[in-house]
Amino acid sequence: MIFDSKKIYEDKVPSWIQNFLKSKQITIIPKAALMLSEFLGNDLSKIANELNKLEIVVGSDKQVTPEIIEENIGISKDFNNFELQKAIGNLDHKKAYQIVNYFAQNHKQHPFVLTISILYMYFTKLMTLHTVSDKSPAAVSKALGVNPYFVSEYITVSKNFPMKRISGVLETLRVYDSKSKGVGANLGPRDLYYELIYNILK
């Protein structure tokens, strides 16, 4: 199956991946779909190419897992932006710093601007969650544009981040986005990541 280089909104990519594989009678764990979308971006031809390779790898198992992604595409299942937002959401300082330390050591594969963008989308969704009166999985999934699989996680995290705290986090992300571009600071990757996590979790 061949696609042109059409691009879609990044938050729609995991669903596109699931549907593409479903057409081949292959399922994918939601976390694995997120890992792929984070790593490959939103270029559908590029994504389709990698998924066609995975079709050969999974064989008769017919399921793509984070482990398969890690082994065959080279994305760490433990050190990625999905795991970082999860660690931050759960206020797991140790795990968050472990992940950004890995990012800083491999900053070409983990550009700071991508982490900022993903965290901004994550906290924007958490802000939206606070405005949703119907907290049923279906309603939250639709309002946030996330797989129902992740709804309970968002609801749990929202208790750690009330609206006022989220507003502060979003402002912090804007500040460090500017700093990463040399505005008001000239910090290396490690310092940027460490300062960012400190200011989000303080």
Predicted regions and their residues:
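Conserved beta/loop motifs at nucleotide-recognition and modification sites
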Residues: M1-K202
